Swiss-Prot record:
InterPro entries: DNA-dir_RNA_pol_bsu_ext_1_sf, DNA-dir_RNA_pol_bsu_external_1, DNA-dir_RNA_pol_su2, DNA-dir_RNAP_su2_dom, DNA-dir_RNAP_su2_hyb_sf, RNA_pol_bsu_bac, RNA_pol_bsu_CS, RNA_pol_bsu_protrusion. NCBIfam families: PRK00405.1, rpoB. It catalyses: RNA(n) + a ribonucleoside 5'-triphosphate = RNA(n+1) + diphosphate. Pfam families: RNA_pol_Rpb2_1, RNA_pol_Rpb2_2, RNA_pol_Rpb2_3, RNA_pol_Rpb2_45, RNA_pol_Rpb2_6, RNA_pol_Rpb2_7. DNA-dependent RNA polymerase catalyzes the transcription of DNA into RNA using the four ribonucleoside triphosphates as substrates. This is DNA-directed RNA polymerase subunit beta. HAMAP family: RNApol_bact_RpoB (MF_01321). One of its GO terms (biological process) is DNA-templated transcription.
């Protein structure tokens, strides 16, 4: 959810560098003081990547493609430096007028005539380039989008376990960023084969000869007289380099004419041509590192050393295995540490926004290259200029295509602040160049040890995408090659230093790393334990002495993502439920009055401030003026900073985006002070739900199957009320019969309908509307045809007579309504940019207050979700000794089997916090209990005891945190003591008002003639096969007939039934449904002549008559049989056209 003022000046870029200042101090239960390594900016992954692209990426792509020469080599086009101009339109205007927030890109282009050396130079406009906003999103056609980071396999050299161990022993592959794959396979029969681009295999020595490794002796000498190579040479029939080249050509291009030149070109083109083969910088780095080579970094094609090095590594491992085990029966667990695996984070890298956009830009430039070549050839030398020869359409369309339709450019999730933050930190293994849902193996989806501190092991979707979409861990960052790094504190001789180093998964394996909660002397930094639990080299967990430790975790939070780190007592929850908890926080609706949790984790502040949803002061100063929509701060140097607040805007998901000032006039502020709250924050902290008093007890069976009972107080006092904003749009177009018109003059409209419309037929702001009300009056001309020229002339002379128009007004859809909060009007006359054929457009925003209702979904932060089954009056709810009724009743059976005990601990600590932890005069205190190092059971017991001693005795709380509750209806106490306390409850976006739906008459499908399905189509309820069986089992024949005919696809029957209902007559008996006729047609299409028979007696009489005629004809010798005309299988009259076809 983007909530920042819209300044179109570059100084705004500085705003993100301000360090936010905490407003609310929490009582902390943290057992560890984290190192000085503060959290990095949580959306840095987006911002820095795009900045790098702007600074270097464009320049690099232009250098790669430059120069473009024509086919004869006489002309060249070179690309020089580039520059961006200021965006012509502000972010706010882009959002209201459906424009893209972009800056014009200009590139210096030189056209060179090689013969004369003449150079013509010009700045060429390369199109508008979408810009990233300061909070890491893009505005494309007026909607906010996020480019998700892609998780892909890194190019490089790999030796891996084979897919089929009965055929191969090991496989090795050289994977480029772009180009042909080279794969080596050690066969169980004891030789080595090679595949290029997954084509047919050939002995590896054939390729080696073709690449110029020499004859058999030289090859053997190069590979240390390996027996595998000797076996391979025995299978190799080629005798010379030329033979080998021709053999490679035959395997790669079967059926093409073979000659030596083509063969040499093929091999050179496959691996050594920079245009067709690109290892990329990352690939070269990985290959050099893995094979211990020192090929220069800028060589991005394969070299002979790469191929030799990979083969050496493969042969070394294979021969070592052969010494101990027989090929075909190998225990791979024993040699796993020597092999590479796809899931290892040293072999997977991130393609961040910048790289993805750069790839789209490169594709556009290469498309443009072809056009430029053709133009240089066809145009006249005198008239050619850079402007005429460069066509920028392909570049603009490639960029547009990426932002508009790439799988990784997504409609931003703005349900609340956390949803937007999580979306920007998402890692997606799918998309172009990634995996597909169907082909992704289990291993890729699984948690891997190298995820530690890099990708969250908990937060991932539950459906078919599980494990393919992840979240960046809190402290993780991305290095220059796209590998994820995580921070560790350096340990020297058993003493922990304050030096923090970021390590990638590859580097980490060479060290021994201790946990964050290793006991350390705060004064000296020495590790006090005699033995330390640590991950040793290679990743196994062991105990070591303090002197052996090289690094130590920075914080226990570094393993999990932001959403997961917001779950208190995460360590007491089962992982499956924690996953649901993390995911459901992203679906929480911002409430009317936001409230931070009593029991937090200390991450709430950074999670809210880094997203740009709260307003931070850019400079220190004094607040001079505060209104609901503006804050003015006078800086210390005397200048003014003005901040615009967003008021009641609609998010992508229809929730409300609103900012409220927190400062008062005259208040002194520092740089980074929180000036205004967003819609789901409170005092600058993330606030997704409400602290409610819950009791764990059954109540009349209403909390069966996780259902929830709530008090009517939550409805009356708007505790769980949220605002939702819907947008409706109408366009007045040009039609064949004339233009549509937005007007108050609607045919056959009563005064009641027009009551809230202004003179132009547009609803006034503040009007309350319900379903069916007119929002914008619009009429469309109707008529059989265009008027003749004579008619037009008469009309021109005598003036326009009332033309035939039909009402096509914009009305509030079925089941919706609310208060009109804003109207935006755009017209061609006012100079607005509208789609072709549209003269005028009106947008109406309608806000609804949604109170909590039965059927709404509530959830805690521990995956404890349920649907409200009953709203009980306050006086009937169970109450405590002091008369306080509880707000929510949850089922106790939902806890043990789900193993999310965190909710119970939260409830106990929440109760103590609500009473000020026995201090603070009984006023609530906000506490923080960080994940994996927060409050213990002893801490909670101590807090409860303190509250019991200091002033909350009247509640009757016992030592274990339980109370006696009394039945609100009878006043009798319940038999057993009950756990009661404060839990943070979220209202989720799955609201009953959006789901409830009923249909009387509505649209039908053209194909099947059955009602459409779904609320959006105003469809019916599907009465499926199993439901039909149920009615058949009860013998409810008439009910079933009605459901299958007049309520479904009996076209005539349904019209007659409607007529009968209107006239108050009995409903006639149904006729044949359309689906039966489809079945008939299908059978006829199989050549079966299916003829419906209606009147059996009439048919038998007809048959008898026909037999009599036949006998008479035979007696007279007359042939009265006739051939059936070809192509007409069914010659019966359509006897059931009475039933309506």
């Amino acid at each position: 959810m983007r909530v920042r003022p819209f300044f179109n000046d570059s100084s705004w870029r500085r705003a993100n560098l301000v360090t936010p200042i905490v407003r609310r101090k929490r009582h902390s239960y943290a057992r560890l003081q984290s190192a000085d390594a503060q959290l990095p900016n949580l959306i840095q992954i987006q911002l820095s990547s795009f900045q790098k692209f702007m600074d270097e990426g464009i320049r690099r792509t232009l250098e790669d493609i430059s120069p473009i020469e024509d086919y004869s080599g006489s002309y060249a086009v070179e690309f020089g430096e580039h520059r961006f101009e200021e965006p012509p339109v502000s972010i706010e205007e882009c959002m209201s007028k459906d424009k893209t927030y972009a800056a014009p890109l200009f590139v210096r282009v030189r056209f060179v005539i090689k013969e004369t050396g003449e150079v013509r130079e010009q700045d060429v406009f390369m199109g508008d380039f979408p810009l990233m906003t300061d909070w890491g999103t893009f505005i494309i056609n007026g909607t906010e989008r996020v480019v998700v980071t892609q998780l892909v396999r890194s190019p490089g050299a790999y030796v891996m376990e084979p897919k089929d161990p009965t055929k191969q022993v090991l496989t090795a592959s050289l994977m480029p960023h772009r180009g042909s794959w080279l794969e080596f396979e050690v066969e169980t029969k004891g030789y080595v084969s090679v595949r290029i681009d997954r084509k047919r295999k050939l002995p590896v020595t054939v390729l080696l000869k073709a690449l110029g490794f020499g004859g058999p002796e030289e090859i053997l000498a190069r590979f240390g007289n390996s027996w595998l190579i000797r076996n391979t040479l025995e299978r190799d029939d080629t005798t010379s380099r030329e033979d080998a080249l021709l053999e490679v050509f035959r395997r790669q291009r079967p059926g093409e004419p073979v000659n030596l030149e083509n063969a040499q070109n093929l091999v050179d083109g496959l691996f050594f041509d920079p245009k067709r083969y690109d290892l990329s910088e990352v690939g070269r780095y990985k290959v050099n590192k893995k094979l211990r080579l020192d090929v220069p970094r800028d060589v991005h094609t394969l070299t002979i050393e790469d191929i030799e090095g990979l083969l050496r590594r493969l042969l070394g491992i294979a021969e070592e295995v052969a010494e101990e085990e027989e090929f075909g029966r190998i225990n791979y667990e024993r040699i796993r540490h020597k092999l590479d695996e796809y899931e290892h984070f040293g072999n997977r890298r991130l393609r961040t926004v910048g790289e993805l956009v750069q790839e789209a830009f490169r594709i556009g430039m290469y498309r443009m290259e072809r056009v430029v070549r053709e133009r240089m050839t066809t145009q006249d030398e005198e008239s050619i200029t850079p402007q005429t020869v460069v066509n920028t359409k392909p570049v603009a369309s490639a960029i547009k295509e990426f932002f508009g339709s790439s799988q990784l450019s997504q409609f931003m999730d703005q349900t609340n602040t956390l949803a937007g933050l999580s979306h920007r930190r998402r890692l997606n293994a799918m998309g172009a160049g990634g995996l597909s849902r169907e082909r992704a193996p289990i291993e890729v989806r699984d948690v891997h040890p190298t995820h530690y501190g890099r990708m969250c092991p908990i937060e991932t979707p539950e459906g078919p995408n599980i494990g393919l979409i992840g979240q960046l861990s809190t402290f993780a960052r991305v290095n220059e090659y796209g590998f994820v790094q995580t921070p560790y504190r350096k340990v020297e001789d058993g003493r922990v230093t304050d030096e923090v180093e970021y390590l990638s998964a590859d580097e980490e394996e060479e060290y021994t790393i201790a946990q964050a909660n290793t006991p350390v002397d705060l004064e000296t930094g020495r590790i006090t334990a005699e033995t330390v639990l640590a991950r040793s080299r290679g990743g196994d967990v062991t105990t070591v002495s303090p002197e052996e430790v090289d690094y130590m975790d920075v914080s226990p939070v570094q393993t999990v993502s932001v959403a997961t780190s917001l779950i208190p007592f995460l360590e007491h929850d089962d992982a499956n439920r924690a996953l649901m908890g993390a995911n459901m926080q992203r679906q929480a609706v911002p409430l009317l009055r936001s409230e931070a949790p009593y029991v937090g984790t200390g991450m709430e502040f950074r999670a809210a401030t880094d997203t740009g949803d709260v307003l931070l002061a850019r400079n220190a100063g004094t607040v001079e003026r505060v209104t609901a929509s503006r804050i003015v701060v006078r800086r210390e140097d005397g200048g003014l900073d003005e901040y615009a607040l967003r008021k009641f805007a609609r998010s992508n998901q229809g929730t409300c985006v609103n900012q409220r000032p927190l400062v008062k006039e005259g208040e002194e502020v520092e740089a980074g002070t929180v000036l205004a709250d967003g819609s789901s924050t409170d005092q600058g902290e993330l606030a997704l739900g409400k602290n409610l008093l819950v009791a764990f007890m059954p109540w009349e069976g209403y909390n069966f199957e996780d259902a929830i009972i709530i008090s009517e107080r939550l409805v009356k006092e708007d505790v769980l009320t949220s605002i939702h904003i819907e947008e409706y749009e109408v366009q007045a177009r040009d039609t064949k019969l004339g233009p549509e018109e937005i007007t108050r003059d609607i045919p056959h409209a009563s005064d009641d309908v027009l009551m809230n419309l202004d003179a132009d037929g547009i609803i006034r702001i503040g009007a309350e509307v319900s379903s069916g009300d007119v929002l914008v009056g619009k009429v469309t001309p109707k008529g059989e045809s265009e008027p003749t020229p004579e008619e037009k002339l008469l009309r021109a002379i005598f003036g326009e007579k009332a033309r035939e128009v039909k009402d096509s007004s914009l009305k509030v859809p079925h089941g919706e309504g609310g208060v009109v909060i804003d109207v935006k009007r755009f017209s061609r006359e006012a100079g607005d940019d509208l789609p072709p054929g549209v003269n005028e457009m009106v947008r109406v925003f309608v806000a609804t207050k949604r109170k909590i209702a039965e059927g709404d979904k509530l959830a805690g932060r521990h995956g404890n979700k349920g649907v409200i089954s009953k709203i009980v009056p306050e006086e009937d709810m169970p109450f405590m000794e002091d008369g306080t009724p509880v707000d929510v009743i949850l089922s106790p059976l939902g806890v043990p089997s789900r193993m999310n005990i965190g909710q119970i601990l939260e409830t106990h600590l929440g109760w103590a916090a609500s009473k000020g932890l026995g201090e603070n005069g009984g006023e609530p205190v906000f506490v923080s209990t960080p994940v994996f190092s927060g409050a213990t059971v002893a801490d909670i017991n101590e807090a409860i005891d303190k509250v019991r001693r200091n002033g909350a005795a009247e509640v009757g709380m016992s030592g274990g945190g339980k109370v006696t509750l009394y039945d609100g209806r009878t006043g009798e106490p319940f038999e057993n003591k009950i756990t009661v306390g404060y839990m943070y409850i979220l209202k989720l976006l799955h609201l009953v008002d959006d789901k409830i739906h009923a249909r009387s008459t509505g649209p039908y499908s053209l194909v099947t003639q059955q009602p459409l399905g779904g609320k959006a189509q105003f469809g019916g309820q599907r009465f499926g096969e199993m439901e039909v069986w149920a009615l058949e089992a009860y013998g409810a024949a008439h009910t079933l007939q009605e459901l299958l005919t007049i309520k479904s696809d009996d076209r005539v029957g349904r019209v007659k039934s409607y007529e009968a209902i209107v006239k108050g007559e009995n409903i006639p008996s149904p006729s044949v449904p359309a689906s039966f006729k489809v079945l008939l047609k299908e059978m006829q299409s199989l050549g079966l002549s299916v003829k419906p028979i209606y009147d059996v007696e009439a048919v038998s009489e007809e048959d008898q008559e026909r037999r009599d005629w036949d006998e008479a004809a035979r007696a007279l010798g007359i042939n009265i049989s006739r051939e059936e005309p070809p192509g007409q299988l069914d010659d019966t009259p359509d006897t059931f056209s009475r039933g309506g076809m």
